[in-house]
C-alpha cells in the first residue's frame, strides 16, 4: 500500500508542496529571529524555544497547515479500490477486514513519516546553529505533530471507506475535522456536556506539546481517536463483506463512540492526568513553593 501511494502523482505533489512551503516558512522565521537577536544584542535566553516552540514557533505553523495535506493523501486509500472493484480481490483473499485497514493505515502514517523528515531536518539544522539547543521539548513538539498526523490519517481512512468518490472523501474529512475543531463550544451551559465536548474537541490538543509539555490526557486522546476511527473503518468493511442490518450498524457505531467517550471522560479527570515538563528550565511548571501553597 505504501508503494502504491508513491505511484500516485498526488502523493508526490503533497510531498513536494509540503517540503517547499515548510522550508520557506522555516527560512523566513529564522531570518526574522536572527534579525531580532542581533538587534537585542544577543540577550535571548532560549533561541531553540523561540524558533520551534510556542504559538509563534516553526512547528506551530506546520501544525496549523497539516490538515490541508492529509485529506488529499487519504481520499483514495479505499475509495479508489472500491470504485475500480479491486477491493473485491482483497475481500476474497484470506485476510480480515482489520488487516486490510491496518495495512492501509500503516501506509498512510508511513507517508506521514516522510512528511516528518522536513521538520526533523529543520530541527537538526537548528541544533547545529543554535547554542545550547534544547532537544527534549522540540522532540515532544515533533511527537505532537506526528500524533496529529496519525489522527487525521485515521479519520481520512474512514471517510475514504464511505464513498467511491475521492473528492467526496476529501471534503468529508475536512468536514469531520471542522466539527472536531468546533465541537468544544457546544453545551457550555451544562457541566457534564461541556466536559464531554471539550474532550472530544481536537482543537488545541497539541498546544501543550508545542510548548514541550506531555499531558497524559492529550496522548490518550490521540490513541482513542485513532482506535475509534480505525474500528469504524474495520466495521464498515466487515458490513460490506457480509449483510448487516442498518439498525445493527447504527447500534455498533454508537457503542464504539460511547465507549471512546467514556474512556476519554474518565482519563481526563484531574486526578488521572499526568504532566511532564521537558523544558530544561521547567518553564511550564510551578515551583515547589507554589505547589505546596496550592496543596494547602
Protein language model annotation of sequence segments:
Residues 23-27, 45-61, 102-166, 225:
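Secretory targeting signals
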Residues 269-296:
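Juxtamembrane extramembrane loops of integral membrane proteins
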Residues 71-91, 105:
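Transmembrane helix boundary and interhelical loop/hinge segments in multi-pass membrane proteins
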Amino acid at each position: 500500500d505504501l508503494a502504491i501511494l508513491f505511484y500516485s502523482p498526488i502523493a508526490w505533489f503533497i510531498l513536494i508542496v509540503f517540503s517547499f512551503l515548510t522550508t520557506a516558512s522555516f527560512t523566513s522565521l529564522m531570518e526574522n529571529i536572527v534579525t531580532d537577536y542581533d538587534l537585542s544584542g544577543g540577550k535571548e535566553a532560549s533561541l531553540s524555544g523561540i524558533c520551534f516552540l510556542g504559538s509563534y514557533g516553526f512547528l506551530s505553523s506546520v501544525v496549523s497547515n497539516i490538515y490541508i495535506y492529509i485529506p488529499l493523501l487519504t481520499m483514495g486509500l479505499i475509495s479508489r479500490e472500491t470504485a475500480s472493484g479491486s477491493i473485491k480481490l482483497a475481500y476474497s483473499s484470506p485476510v480480515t477486514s482489520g488487516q486490510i485497514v491496518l495495512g492501509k493505515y500503516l501506509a498512510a502514517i508511513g507517508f506521514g513519516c516522510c512528511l516528518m523528515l522536513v521538520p526533523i531536518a529543520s530541527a537538526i539544522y537548528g541544533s547545529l546553529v543554535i547554542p545550547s539547543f534544547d532537544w527534549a521539548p522540540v522532540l515532544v513538539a515533533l511527537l505532537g505533530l506526528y500524533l496529529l498526523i496519525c489522527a487525521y490519517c485515521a479519520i481520512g481512512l474512514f471517510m475514504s471507506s464511505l464513498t467511491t468518490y475521492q473528492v467526496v472523501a476529501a471534503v468529508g474529512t475536512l468536514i469531520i475535522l471542522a466539527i472536531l475543531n468546533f465541537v468544544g463550544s457546544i453545551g457550555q451551559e451544562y457541566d457534564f456536556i461541556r466536559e464531554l465536548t471539550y474532550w472530544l474537541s481536537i482543537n488545541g490538543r497539541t498546544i501543550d506539546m508545542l510548548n514541550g509539555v506531555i499531558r497524559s490526557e492529550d496522548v490518550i486522546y490521540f490513541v482513542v481517536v485513532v482506535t475509534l476511527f480505525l474500528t469504524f473503518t474495520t466495521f464498515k468493511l466487515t458490513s460490506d463483506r457480509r449483510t448487516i442490518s442498518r439498525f445493527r450498524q447504527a447500534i455498533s457505531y454508537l457503542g464504539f463512540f460511547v465507549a471512546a467517550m467514556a474512556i476519554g471522560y474518565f482519563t481526563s479527570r484531574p486526578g488521572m492526568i499526568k504532566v511532564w515538563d521537558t523544558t530544561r528550565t521547567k518553564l511550564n511548571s510551578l515551583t515547589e513553593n507554589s505547589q505546596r501553597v496550592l496543596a494547602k
